[in-house]
A protein has these predicted regions:
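Disulfide-bonded cysteine-rich modules in secreted/extracellular proteins
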Residues: 27-42, 161-171
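Repeat-associated, polar segments at repeat-unit boundaries in modular proteins
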Residues: 16-28, 153-166
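Acidic, glycine-rich calcium-binding repeat modules characteristic of RTX/beta-roll
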Residues: 1-15, 39-125, 131-149, 154
Protein backbone atom coordinates (compact mmCIF):
# COMPACT_ATOMS: atom_id res chain seq x y z
CA UNK A 1 0.00 0.00 0.00
CA UNK A 2 0.89 3.65 -0.06
CA UNK A 3 2.82 5.00 2.90
CA UNK A 4 2.65 8.57 4.18
CA UNK A 5 5.28 10.60 5.98
CA UNK A 6 3.92 13.45 8.09
CA UNK A 7 6.40 15.90 9.60
CA UNK A 8 4.60 18.02 12.16
CA UNK A 9 5.64 21.64 12.69
CA UNK A 10 8.11 21.40 9.77
CA UNK A 11 7.60 25.05 8.85
CA UNK A 12 8.02 26.29 12.43
CA UNK A 13 11.83 26.10 12.14
CA UNK A 14 14.06 29.09 11.48
CA UNK A 15 15.17 27.79 8.08
CA UNK A 16 15.26 24.72 5.90
CA UNK A 17 15.18 21.44 7.75
CA UNK A 18 16.72 18.30 6.30
CA UNK A 19 15.55 14.78 7.03
CA UNK A 20 17.37 11.60 6.07
CA UNK A 21 15.26 8.52 5.57
CA UNK A 22 17.51 5.48 5.25
CA UNK A 23 16.80 2.34 3.30
CA UNK A 24 14.66 3.87 0.57
CA UNK A 25 14.79 6.00 -2.55
CA UNK A 26 12.53 8.84 -1.47
CA UNK A 27 12.48 10.49 -4.94
CA UNK A 28 10.93 7.36 -6.40
CA UNK A 29 8.18 7.28 -3.80
CA UNK A 30 6.81 10.81 -3.82
CA UNK A 31 4.21 11.17 -6.56
CA UNK A 32 1.92 13.90 -5.16
CA UNK A 33 2.59 16.97 -3.02
CA UNK A 34 -0.28 18.92 -1.43
CA UNK A 35 0.02 22.47 -0.16
CA UNK A 36 -2.13 24.23 2.37
CA UNK A 37 -4.45 27.24 2.40
CA UNK A 38 -1.41 29.38 3.29
CA UNK A 39 1.31 30.65 0.95
CA UNK A 40 3.40 27.58 0.08
CA UNK A 41 6.74 27.06 -1.65
CA UNK A 42 6.91 23.54 -3.05
CA UNK A 43 9.53 21.93 -5.22
CA UNK A 44 10.00 18.46 -6.68
CA UNK A 45 13.39 18.60 -8.35
CA UNK A 46 13.18 15.08 -9.67
CA UNK A 47 13.34 13.36 -13.04
CA UNK A 48 10.16 11.51 -12.08
CA UNK A 49 6.76 12.99 -12.86
CA UNK A 50 5.17 14.54 -9.78
CA UNK A 51 1.72 16.07 -9.18
CA UNK A 52 1.92 19.25 -7.10
CA UNK A 53 -1.28 20.86 -5.80
CA UNK A 54 -0.94 24.24 -4.14
CA UNK A 55 -4.53 24.37 -2.82
CA UNK A 56 -5.15 27.90 -1.40
CA UNK A 57 -2.80 30.83 -0.84
CA UNK A 58 -0.27 32.49 -3.11
CA UNK A 59 2.01 29.58 -3.92
CA UNK A 60 5.32 29.06 -5.71
CA UNK A 61 5.54 25.61 -7.30
CA UNK A 62 8.64 24.16 -9.02
CA UNK A 63 8.22 21.02 -11.09
CA UNK A 64 11.78 20.03 -12.00
CA UNK A 65 12.86 17.80 -14.88
CA UNK A 66 10.04 15.24 -14.96
CA UNK A 67 6.69 15.31 -16.74
CA UNK A 68 4.86 17.07 -13.91
CA UNK A 69 1.29 18.19 -13.20
CA UNK A 70 1.16 21.61 -11.52
CA UNK A 71 -2.10 22.90 -10.01
CA UNK A 72 -1.79 26.13 -8.04
CA UNK A 73 -5.38 26.11 -6.82
CA UNK A 74 -6.89 29.36 -5.58
CA UNK A 75 -4.66 32.36 -5.00
CA UNK A 76 -2.08 34.08 -7.18
CA UNK A 77 0.48 31.40 -7.96
CA UNK A 78 3.81 31.05 -9.79
CA UNK A 79 4.22 27.72 -11.58
CA UNK A 80 7.68 26.76 -12.85
CA UNK A 81 7.59 23.67 -15.03
CA UNK A 82 11.22 22.88 -15.67
CA UNK A 83 12.41 20.72 -18.54
CA UNK A 84 9.75 18.01 -18.79
CA UNK A 85 6.49 17.81 -20.73
CA UNK A 86 4.39 19.47 -18.05
CA UNK A 87 0.65 19.86 -17.51
CA UNK A 88 -0.80 22.94 -15.81
CA UNK A 89 -4.30 23.08 -14.31
CA UNK A 90 -6.24 26.37 -14.23
CA UNK A 91 -9.89 27.12 -13.49
CA UNK A 92 -12.39 29.77 -12.51
CA UNK A 93 -11.68 31.21 -9.09
CA UNK A 94 -7.95 30.44 -9.38
CA UNK A 95 -6.91 34.11 -9.35
CA UNK A 96 -3.88 35.36 -11.29
CA UNK A 97 -1.46 32.53 -12.03
CA UNK A 98 1.83 32.80 -13.89
CA UNK A 99 3.57 29.98 -15.77
CA UNK A 100 7.25 29.83 -16.64
CA UNK A 101 8.39 26.75 -18.53
CA UNK A 102 11.84 26.06 -19.97
CA UNK A 103 11.34 23.18 -22.34
CA UNK A 104 9.29 20.29 -23.52
CA UNK A 105 5.70 20.43 -24.68
CA UNK A 106 3.26 21.91 -22.20
CA UNK A 107 -0.46 21.30 -21.74
CA UNK A 108 -2.74 23.80 -20.01
CA UNK A 109 -5.99 22.17 -18.86
CA UNK A 110 -8.74 24.72 -18.33
CA UNK A 111 -10.96 22.55 -16.17
CA UNK A 112 -14.16 24.61 -16.17
CA UNK A 113 -13.46 27.26 -18.81
CA UNK A 114 -14.90 27.14 -22.34
CA UNK A 115 -13.01 28.53 -25.31
CA UNK A 116 -15.64 31.27 -25.77
CA UNK A 117 -15.01 32.57 -22.23
CA UNK A 118 -11.43 33.79 -22.71
CA UNK A 119 -9.57 36.68 -24.26
CA UNK A 120 -5.99 36.02 -25.37
CA UNK A 121 -3.45 38.85 -25.52
CA UNK A 122 0.21 38.90 -26.59
CA UNK A 123 2.09 41.27 -24.26
CA UNK A 124 5.60 42.54 -24.91
CA UNK A 125 5.93 40.05 -27.80
CA UNK A 126 6.80 37.19 -25.45
CA UNK A 127 4.10 37.00 -22.77
CA UNK A 128 0.72 35.40 -23.37
CA UNK A 129 -2.15 36.55 -21.17
CA UNK A 130 -5.41 34.60 -21.01
CA UNK A 131 -8.20 36.46 -19.21
CA UNK A 132 -11.42 34.70 -18.21
CA UNK A 133 -14.13 37.12 -19.36
CA UNK A 134 -16.34 38.53 -16.60
CA UNK A 135 -13.97 37.43 -13.81
CA UNK A 136 -10.77 38.60 -12.15
CA UNK A 137 -9.03 35.35 -13.20
CA UNK A 138 -6.01 35.57 -15.46
CA UNK A 139 -3.36 33.12 -16.62
CA UNK A 140 -0.03 34.59 -17.76
CA UNK A 141 2.63 32.59 -19.59
CA UNK A 142 5.99 34.36 -19.50
CA UNK A 143 8.33 33.74 -22.40
CA UNK A 144 5.94 31.44 -24.25
CA UNK A 145 7.91 31.95 -27.46
CA UNK A 146 11.02 30.50 -25.82
CA UNK A 147 9.43 27.16 -24.92
CA UNK A 148 10.62 24.98 -27.78
CA UNK A 149 7.72 22.52 -27.56
CA UNK A 150 4.90 25.06 -27.54
CA UNK A 151 1.66 24.98 -25.55
CA UNK A 152 -1.60 23.11 -26.00
CA UNK A 153 -4.73 24.46 -24.27
CA UNK A 154 -7.52 21.98 -23.48
CA UNK A 155 -10.82 23.77 -22.79
CA UNK A 156 -13.81 22.37 -20.87
CA UNK A 157 -15.98 22.50 -24.02
CA UNK A 158 -13.61 20.13 -25.86
CA UNK A 159 -11.92 22.84 -27.92
CA UNK A 160 -8.14 22.66 -28.24
CA UNK A 161 -5.93 25.68 -28.73
CA UNK A 162 -2.24 25.68 -29.61
CA UNK A 163 0.37 28.39 -29.50
CA UNK A 164 3.84 28.04 -30.91
CA UNK A 165 5.96 31.15 -31.41
CA UNK A 166 3.75 33.56 -33.42
CA UNK A 167 0.73 31.34 -34.12
CA UNK A 168 -2.47 30.82 -32.08
CA UNK A 169 -4.89 28.20 -33.39
CA UNK A 170 -8.21 27.06 -31.94
CA UNK A 171 -9.90 23.85 -33.10
Amino acid sequence: GADNIIIKQYFDGAGFQNFNINGTMINDLITTLHGSDSNDWMSAWSDNGVTIKGEGGNDTINGGNGDDILDGGTGNDWLYGGNGNDTYIFGKGYGNDTIEDWGGSSIVKLKDISSSEVTITNLWDSTLEMTVNGTEDKLTINGYKWNQGGYTFEFADGAVGTVNKDTWELE
